[in-house]
Amino acid sequence: SPTYMCSPSWQFKKFAEATSKIWFTQGWKDKVFGGFNNSASFNGDKQVSLIALQTLASQHGGIWVSLGLLPSNSKDATRKDLNNLGGSVGLLVQSPSDASVDEIPQGDLDTAVSYGKRVAEITAKLA
């Protein structure tokens, strides 16, 4: 979900609220969940949105997969490095507001691939 005005977008909130019937039956209990977030700013309150996604997963009794990467926070780090935004709860992506989807920084794309593999590997271990 994108972060928009301090939280996940209204479209995601609509989806989340529509899951209440599944919650009553615990239909997603022990399912694997993961999340990512994008905003135009480097921080942009992405953590708030990820915690909302993680909380929804927890309410459903799900198993949340963290990012599992150390941050790239040395002086030599660039936007081409894995986890250069320093996420831990889930994937963080930053896209300038005037950029096209083809201009997402390579480090964010590579981090997304790494996170997708992690979610798949953990899902396979639990299967």
Where do the model's predicted regions map?
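Glycine-rich phosphate/pyrophosphate-binding loop and the adjoining helix
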Residues: 68-127
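Helix-loop-strand module that forms the ligand-binding subsite of alpha/beta enzymes
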Residues: 1-77
